[in-house]
Amino acid sequence: MRGKSELVKPDTHNQTKGGLERDYITQWSYGIGETFSLLVPNVKGGASVPLAANEKAMEKANPMYGSIYNQLGQYWGEQPGTSGPVYVGAFVMFLFILGLFVVKGPMKWALLAATVLSVLLSWGKNFMGFTDFFLDYIPMYDKFRAVSSILVIAEFTIPLLAMLALKQIIARPQIMKEQAKAFYISFGLTGGIALLFALAPRFFFPSYVSSMEMQALQSIPADQLAPLIANLEEVRVSIFTSDAWRSFFVVSIGAVLLWLYGMGKLKSELTIGVLLLLCLVEMWNVNKRYLYDAQFVPQTVRTESFRPTETDKAILEDKTLDYRVLNLASNTFNENNTSYWHKSIGGYHAAKLRRYQEMIEEHISPEMSNLFKAVSEAGGDMAKVDASAFPVLNMLNTRYFIFPLQGGKTMPIQNPYTLGNAWFVDKVQYVNNANEEIESLHKVMPAKVAVVDKKFAEQVKPVAVSDSLRFVKLVAYEPNDLKYEVSSEKGGVVVFSEIYYPGWQAYIDGVEAPHGRADYILRAMNVPAGKHTVEFKFDPKSLHTTETIAFVALGLLAMAVLLLVAVSYTHLR
């Protein structure tokens, strides 16, 4: 999410000083118990794929629950969903623990500290005091979401210390005798724990159904729910225990090989080769769960996923320079197929503008619900639909709606109420802050009134008079260069259906002119009477500044190289 929120919300604890909200940042928090996935990958089921896809686990399933298991995921952890666990290898974890005893020097402590830090931070809302400290006092930390991703540090540090431990043992096999106690402790903390998981899974994890799943299953009658939960837990326990046994045997095989090497029974070359093969086979087996053969498809198949539908083709026949499309037939803000063919109101991007996200939550999503209901009741006849039900969608130049039909088909519906690329307004309404600005859009019609934060009062001045003959027309469009023809007898304020963003420069007849923000996300400016060409160019000053710095740095680097060559040449003579 890009940009700092200017909205003041009642729950101030949920807000950070300048980044994302705490709930949003910690939504994907790794569970404390889930951390054992470093040793046993399926400690919480693995990935959020249909449970029914696991054929081995389905051997424990009651066939009468097949349709339900198609809807339930294999993952039952605390995160909303996941593509897979964080796993470094069972034997690698054994070597990591052993490395804490046999590796000497500051490197060991640095790797241990980094590992512990990444684990604690990955817990997010499950260790909120620690997370709050980092959000409040560590620069830039509040700009990132999905705290569980910080385990990538542990995925680097754990294998590194494991390799250092193996290096020590291979170089000095007598360590196995000198550090026999450390060897047993390391085995107990890895292989021993895996064995306990396999033998007593319910002792360590009493429940195998997430709280979200329990809420979703509450609609099932109580007398049917109890046996379903019992069978579901049996299926998931089998997933967990089978992986626990696998980790136990991997650690045991690796530990036996190391012990035999330490006792002089195996040569170093053979030991290293077999251990490498063990790790390769073990990691390959786990990796193939998530990167399997069926995912590798011919390029032609991949490109066919973006083939235009009949609805797309119909919309693309409209050669108007610039307009937007709202897809109501899909998960609007979590799909990008629409954006492949059209300028979309929706689409997904992990770093979308915060202001636009706030508009989605406050206006666009509610208006989509109103629109869907109104169009359905009108049978697709937009003449029977009240435009006041979706004013923000109209100001965003939404020219077409993709509407769902039965059988997975869709149809395009043209919106006759869209305000177009730009328009004159009759009034400018100034507000004191962002809260008033976004809330005022519930009360005004953007076609007539521009809501402007008072900090843009100098850039967007009040409208003196109205003019019935005025018009604005987009005449040239490039993503970074837009030109409009503007004509009016008395001048006024024009609102442009484009996102206000720093770096855009406005020009009237080639002369730079001020512009400001209106309606929370759009651009607005005063245009004098007469016929004019208004142009917006994306030309951020920061680009020129960094370009100058880059050229200076390259010049200094070139001079340094020449000086070095000259000095070397002098010494040679």
Regions found by a protein language model. Give the residues of each.
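Active-site-adjacent bridging/hinge elements
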Residues: 61-73, 91, 127-138, 224-232, ...
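Contiguous transmembrane helix-bundle modules in multi-pass membrane proteins
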Residues: 103-308, 529-573
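Active-site-proximal, structured, solvent-exposed surfaces of multi-pass membrane proteins
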Residues: 94, 399, 408, 448-568, ...
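Extracytoplasmic/lumenal acceptor-recognition loop(s) of multi-pass membrane glycoenzymes
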Residues: 31, 43, 208-211, 275-306, ...
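Individual transmembrane alpha-helix segments
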Residues: 36-92, 236-245
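Aromatic-rich transmembrane-lumenal/periplasmic boundary elements in polytopic membrane proteins
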Residues: 1-56, 206-209
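C-terminal, active-site-flanking charged/polar segments
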Residues: 6-13, 158-161, 179-195, 276-283, ...
